[in-house]
Amino acid sequence: MARTTDDSKKAAPAAGTADEAQKQKALKMVLTQIKRNFGEGAIMRLGENTRIRVETVPSGAITLDLALGGGLPRGRVIEIYGPESSGKTTLALHAIAEIQKTGGVAAFVDAEHALDPAYAKVLGVNVDDLIISQPDTGEMAMEIVDQLVRSAAIDVIVIDSVAALVPRAEIEGEMGDAHVGLQARLMSQALRKITGNIGKTGCMVIFLNQLRSKIGVMYGNPETTTGGNALKFYASVRLDIRKAETLKKGQDEYGNRVRVKVVKNKVAPPFRKAEFDIIFGKGISSLGCILDLAVEMEIVERKGAWYSYGSERLGQGRENVLALLEENAAQAQEIEIKVREKIASGAAVPAAAVAAPDEGDDDLGDEEV
């Protein structure tokens, strides 16, 4: 009797191996069938291609690229939101300029009818090659975006802005009519339709969004973004951009210091922050970003208000040092090369550029109108 029990124990592993082989055979058959029906790449084991990685595009500010884990991801939905005049459009135009530098094609859906071609040109955008649309309705705007994405000929599309995507029913209706949830429904339907194609074609779609205040909120963050909840879910990256301080020379204002919080990031660690200068009429100060990182990485030494590079004293005050480096392009390039070499060698992102989000960062609700 004891021998029979022992025999059954020995037979059990063999039966388990047979079941496992049968399961693997069935799995192989179904994977082959799915690939035959839907094409190669429709389904795969994650370990089959260890080289799968998200390709990124520079944002125009190297400090923000570090906070994003390399830059703005291609083939993803990105939302940039913030108060008025915080730098949303400037950041989007810099992204367009960076893509055009590599030979990419860009489109700008100007729902606000407020794009300034002269300013875009100053930021480095090739306005002659920029594809622009000024749609009459929200449905028209999203249909144009869908067709551009499906063409697989566009590298980046900027929609400025979600708040200006007015549904057709609202435009054709009377001024006092209530249209509850129309815009949220429009965004939900459109994003369901275009998201799959965005991933297949590698097109980056950037939505610019505005902030609203929720009435009657006693606790928590009263701010909300427009367009419902769909964009929050479909976006791989959400950037909250705010003015941190005004840059002045004497009494004259010449720019803004802005702070960007990576509220959501599906392709790199979230909750990082980046700061950079936006100069009026010139855009993002790339030299300012390099100087800030050089100080953090101890390539440039700062003692009090004085800056030194090696044995050379650069000057007193950040503005004076930036002016000096603008005149001395060779020295500025030398510092930039050292900064980029440190980043490429895997140097940690400076602690000043990484921080936990402020309370309420990810509590932005969404209005349904």
From Swiss-Prot:
Residues 358-369 have a biased composition (Acidic residues). Can catalyze the hydrolysis of ATP in the presence of single-stranded DNA, the ATP-dependent uptake of single-stranded DNA by duplex DNA, and the ATP-dependent hybridization of homologous single-stranded DNAs. It interacts with LexA causing its activation and leading to its autocatalytic cleavage. Residues 1-20, 350-369 are annotated as: Disordered. The gene is recA. The lineage of its organism: Bacteria, Bacillati, Cyanobacteriota, Cyanophyceae, Gloeobacterales. It comes from Gloeobacter violaceus (strain ATCC 29082 / PCC 7421). The keyword tRNA processing does not apply. The keyword Transmembrane helix does not apply. PANTHER family: MITOCHONDRIAL DNA REPAIR PROTEIN RECA HOMOLOG-RELATED, RECA. GO terms for biological process: DNA recombination; DNA repair; SOS response. This is Protein RecA.
